[in-house]
Amino acid sequence: MHKELYPVNSEVAKKAWIDEAKYKAMYERSIQDNEAFWAEQAERLDWIKKWDKVKEVSFKKPVSIKWYLGGKMNVSYNCVDRHLKTRGDKTALLWEADNPSTPSRKITYKELHLEVCRFANVLKKMGVKKGDVVTIYMPMIPDTAVAMLACARIGAVHSVVFAGFSPDSISDRILDGQCRFVITGDAGFRGSKVVALKENIDKALVKTPDVQKVLVVKYAGTTVDMKPGRDLWYHEEVKTVSDQCEPEPMDAEDPLFILYTSGSTGKPKGVMHTTGGYLVYASMTHQYVFDYHEDDIYWCSADVGWVTGHSYIVYGPLANGATSLFFEGVPNYPTPSRFWEVVDKHKVTIFYTSPTAIRSLMREGDAAVKTTSRKTLRLLGSVGEPINPEAWAWYHDVVGEGRCPVVDTWWQTETGGILITPLPGAIAQKPGSATLPFFGVQPKLLTNEGQEIHGPGEGVLVIADSWPGQMRTVYRNHERFEDTYFSNYPGYYFTGDGCRRDQDGYYWITGRVDDVINVSGHRLGTAEIESALVAHHKVAEAAVVGYPHDIKGQGIYAFVTLKSGETASEELRKELIQTVRKEIGPIATPDLIQWAPRLPKTRSGKIMRRILRKIAENHPDQLGDTTTLSEPAVVQELVDNRMNR
């Protein structure tokens, strides 16, 4: 059994940036004297021109969020150039390959500077200009961080697409971003499998006629088709350019990147983050949440295709002059000891991973952990979804041997950085709780009707005021931004998560309240999975819900109604799984498919997902009121044939 409360270790508190007294004082000031507080925090970066006004925010329609108005800076300069005098020979990126026998790579800040300048000059030569959107579909190699920083250097907006996404998902994102330039690799590796990146791009580009140039990084050495006039090899182009490139002065509110995330309506949303506020927030949260100090070796095991990789592998750590480890592999290849072997090999001090990875390694037993030393570790972090207390305790007691605080961080693609988290030297930890808000963050709990809940209680989690890392809009669709985040509870940012607050004021995230499933820390819209299923010619209708999954947190449970005359079969089930994998990617593979002759609907024809959720969760005793259904008998039929018992 785990304890309910893990007090702050006094040794940790002594060395930490923030102790309990400082947290309370700084938090109080960040709320009471908000603008002065955020003006001070912005001094951590180098500005070409200081801002005229700290913030201008309205959470009421028309929604507008602006920070550091009139300020000018360059993100690439702040992550690379400004470290050259004092940290030029320090390792910036430490790369560990998928295959443990592949030599690791160290790239110093001096080397990173030259690589970023060269890459930026190749982009310019291709015709990329300030404000252009560039799609990046790359393996987890240092060139990916270089490509992102090169875009930031010349003022281009990057749109990184996770390398596990299918050609259809890539083309959707290219079209939505009106993107004319793509950067990819020949192929990548993941758990010994080859990921055919260039081949996927070629398939995606059939639907995207506006793409003019594709820059291909030679990495895996696979044979790929190169289309003359469109496709360019990076290793050939880079020979023709200079290794110096002046950083473009950018307005604080100029876009830095777009990152697509799942929405409840199906079409992925282009979450847009801007330059100044985003970097202030990524840098500050990286320093204080992970208690980062100059000699730390920091490793976030996420993929750069997700926001965690943007904020806490690339931008936050590099803005702080850190050594950031870039890992190509997976937790269990070639053995379940891999994470801890990498920790020992590179003397990692701070380690940040997902509950899914922790649960999958916990299932393998303690022996795989205990064959390694891990003595350099001093802090552990968790991100992507709520961590169950048992996994938290195993992470703390077995991996961290009871000496490493665990920062269980809650945040979202939309928030740019961590919003609710323990600070290791200041806040006692409760397994499973995200604990308390970060500086300047004002969480509130509301009833479904929008009434604020004071003290302990459970409700919908909203945030009452802006913070610099907040997204500014949905790319080219501000109306959708307002509708999704600001219309349910006017005057607040709606997170889409449910939350409980205990008697100590600690926050416990209870999961999504909208139609989004959190699978292995990755958000998937149920609507996009349903659309993929219904795209099969034998399917009439589909409804997808999440259900508790021991490893992934949530699994995907699909109820499928076939067209009349069609017959369910194991063969068809496999076909449907392949359809979803092709349309969205392997991450969206349904775990369970139940054949449903009919779906429970209200008299107005709306599918009652609440009921389907209870059936999928194996709680047929908690169905609640079914009298509003047009055919109540449907429910018993589904209960009798449920897959998850």
Curated annotation (Swiss-Prot):
The record's account of how the chain is modified after translation: Acetylated. Deacetylation by the SIR2-homolog deacetylase activates the enzyme.
GO biological process: acetyl-CoA biosynthetic process from acetate
InterPro entries from the UniProt entry: Ac_CoA_lig (IPR011904), ACAS_N (IPR032387), AMP-bd_C (IPR025110), AMP-bd_C_sf (IPR045851), AMP-binding_CS (IPR020845), AMP-dep_synth/lig_dom (IPR000873), ANL_N_sf (IPR042099)
Signal peptide: none
Annotated positions binding ATP: G384, E385, P386, D408, T409, W410, W411, Q412, T413, D497, R512, R523
PROSITE patterns registered for this protein in UniProt: AMP_BINDING
Domain of life: Bacteria
EC number: 6.2.1.1
Enzyme class: ligase
Binding site for CoA: R190, G191, S192, K193, T308, N332, S520, R581
Binding site for Mg(2+): V534, H536, V539
Cofactor dependency: Mg(2+)
UniProt keyword terms in alphabetical order: Acetylation, ATP-binding, Ligase, Magnesium, Metal-binding, Nucleotide-binding
Family listed: Belongs to the ATP-dependent AMP-binding enzyme family.
Protein name according to UniProt: Acetyl-coenzyme A synthetase
Taxonomic lineage from the root: Bacteria, Pseudomonadati, Bdellovibrionota, Bdellovibrionia, Bdellovibrionales
